[in-house]
Amino acid sequence: MADSSESFNIATSPRTGSRRDALTSSPGRDLPPFEDESEGMFGDEVPREEEEDGEELIGDAMERDYRAISELDRYEAEGLDDEDDVEDLTASQRDAAEQAMRMRDREMGHELGRMRRGLLYDSDEEDEDRPARKRRMAERAAEGAPEEDEEMIESIENLEDMKGHTVREWVSMAATRLEIYHRFKNFLRTHVDEHGHNVFKEKISDMCKENKESLVVNYEDLAAREHVLAYFLPEAPAEMLKIFDEAAKEVVLVMYPKYDRIAREIHVRISHLPLVEELRSLRQLHLNQLIRTSGVVTCCTGVLPQLSMVKYNCNKCNFILGPFFQSQNQEVKPGSCPECQSLGPFEINMEETVYQNYQRITIQESPGKVAAGRLPRSKDAILLADLVDSCKPGDEIELTGTYHNNYDGSLNTANGFPVFATVILANHITKKDDKVAVGELTDEDVKAIVALSKDERIGERIFASIAPSIYGHEDIKRGLALALFGGEAKNPGGKHKVRGDINVLLCGDPGTAKSQFLKYVEKVASRAVFTTGQGASAVGLTAYVQRHPVTKEWTLEAGALVLADRGVCLIDEFDKMNDQDRTSIHEAMEQQSISISKAGIVTSLQARCTIIAASNPIGGRYDPSLTFSENVDLTEPIVSRFDILCVVRDTVDPVQDEMLARFVVGSHIKHHPSSKDIANGEEFALPNTFGVEPLPQEVLKKYIMYSKEKIHPKLNQMDQDKVAKMYSDLRKESMATGSIPITVRHIESMIRMAEAHARMHLRDYVVEDDVNMAIRVMLESFIDTQKFSVMRSMRKTFARYLAFRRDNNELLLFVLKQLVAEQTSYQRNRYGAQQDTIEVPEKDLVDKARQINIHNLSAFYDSDLFKMNRFTHDVKKKMIIQQF
């Protein structure tokens, strides 16, 4: 072992022998070779691969290698500054020198830095991931990205330190781009919600199932996880979104390797940007920044092809030049042909050029957000890729995009000096109508909706949820609820369409909350268009033709009924419309389409909407001694197209008036609570005439959307004989009274209302209860339009139909009020003035109750409804007393 050590020391010492021998011969060359090449020092096995790596210099006697040898320890003194007198630098001088060196390095650029780092690598080395890197570089070259070797780019740990650069300059640097790329890719892979679910894994899966190319990223999530990226994004959106798109594409291709056959690019869409700018507040400081604004789409061009990656043919040598990637700001053209060095001419290669979808829209400020006395401002926006056709005229949208400027020669001519036109390059669009869309309903929402449908009184709860701040008017609330749910449209054999929407007409005295009902429906309906008859013309309701300002072609612009397709069109002051304008909606109300033949355009537009109109009677107030047709200035074809007619009368009833006043005052107190009430924790509960708890507005909206989308009731189990007998009875009564004509349309109306009631309960088939409710609503609508003299006898005739789903207490209260009205009229005629108390014999109420098969009245006397209307029962006198 000692011999081995001695041999090791002699062999590994570079200082043995003369200087020339040390420089010209390798150490250990004079040693005898090992007998076994696999046998190393100390008898250890040495792999053969280590022979090329040199000899082992570390051993037990390695200190002897560093002993002093005077003959050999001589070095050249040239270039050494040990003996020069150099003063030590101060701290300020050192900082100044380092600053100067940093400035020099910055001017030399990052290319030199990459080249210097590249010299450290052996050119003969073969990287293990060479095929993958070649493929990645080829893909980046095909996409127009600069060829960069990630291994040669120095990583940045402190991304916030921009070293004096602007955000746009800092983000454009290669090292910064690479760091942002990795951070965003890691964010997409690892971000989870509060339940621990991977957010973007589900989003990417849903996106690929629908063959889309947009991945929506919530800005609030990005800011919470990667605040530096969230800071850079609004300042340099074009550069950041390009990096985001590349990272998102790589993440998608890892999950679905062949998805690039479906979508060449993946676009990251930014939603929930915190700051919302108004269109009129956009200024110069917003240029080239990410903004979020809102407005109404007023104009929309067709979808046009835009050059994305263009290739040119040289007409002289047929060489294909390119690809050239076009940007939004400038057009890229080839200078000369690299094959024949000619300067042209060049023509576009149509086969290899890649196009993308392009659409230009105009958004205008929402009418409710414009200050008094101001005109609404508008701004153009550009939609690219899969954003095209994501909105149409009339939609109120929230738009997130980059605020750009471009050159416009017409503006320079008009202003006399250089002015740039501004445009918004859209990144993300959200319709305000679709915020609660069926696709966005969660599983918890669906479970809650199905659980609500199993409630026995869900129908009454929905009726009570319609305009809960309006007291009474149960018939109007019932009709509007049925109209919101709607029936089922039919098209037997594809030959004749039968509408499924229910049209409602509200007519009555002023001040009876008709317009408030319309406003509430506008909030609850998923898609609603509100207009007034006085401000709406025929073309404003249907459609009109105008010359497009950009293309100078005649274009068709949609009116209110077309914009309300698949929704609700609300028309207030329906009686103020001109007769010519009113007749224009005949086709829309029945066939649900609008035929246009103007300026060489012959087409038909869809208007599949529910129409809810409100009108005032002739002379201002409704006269109960006249029929409905004599009270309203509407033609018979229009009236027959409405399924439900609701007449609202402002009658004088001291008890009802006091209850209404209490309700209004209580509503104001609830919405303006005092500090004392808040401190005491008191809650004001508005009285409810239905006696059930109403649904919250958001829940009702989701319930309606789910039922209209998922439930399609059928008529297999419908009682046809009952509907036929009811129709014949109504025809006979209408001929006798001459109020409103009963036509075959009313049979279809009853069927539609039965389907709507079944849909309200999430039933797949129409049952007897649905038919009974439809008959009851139809009868109430028909009886309310009769003269007062005919109304009472007609209620007796159809009493068994009207009693459906009515509480016995409600029926008894209605009968008791009729007896009180008769007694009041008698006392007024006898004594000349109304008394403070009215007494009705109990026997009269018992006789009336037996006619409707009610025999026990004790529960009615003890009910809250009896006491709420200020009735008391005197058992000794056998009288029912009402105090005013």
Curated annotation (Swiss-Prot):
Which species does this protein come from? Xenopus tropicalis
Q: Biological process GO annotation list?
A: cell cycle DNA replication; DNA replication initiation; regulation of DNA-templated DNA replication initiation
| Top EC class, one word | hydrolase
E.C. no: 3.6.4.12
Q: Which Pfam families match?
A: MCM (PF00493), MCM2_N (PF12619), MCM_lid (PF17855), MCM_N (PF14551), MCM_OB (PF17207), WH_MCM2 (PF23669)
Q: Which reaction does it catalyse?
A: ATP + H2O = ADP + phosphate + H(+)
The protein in question is named DNA replication licensing factor mcm2
A GO cellular component annotated for this chain's UniProt record is:
CMG complex
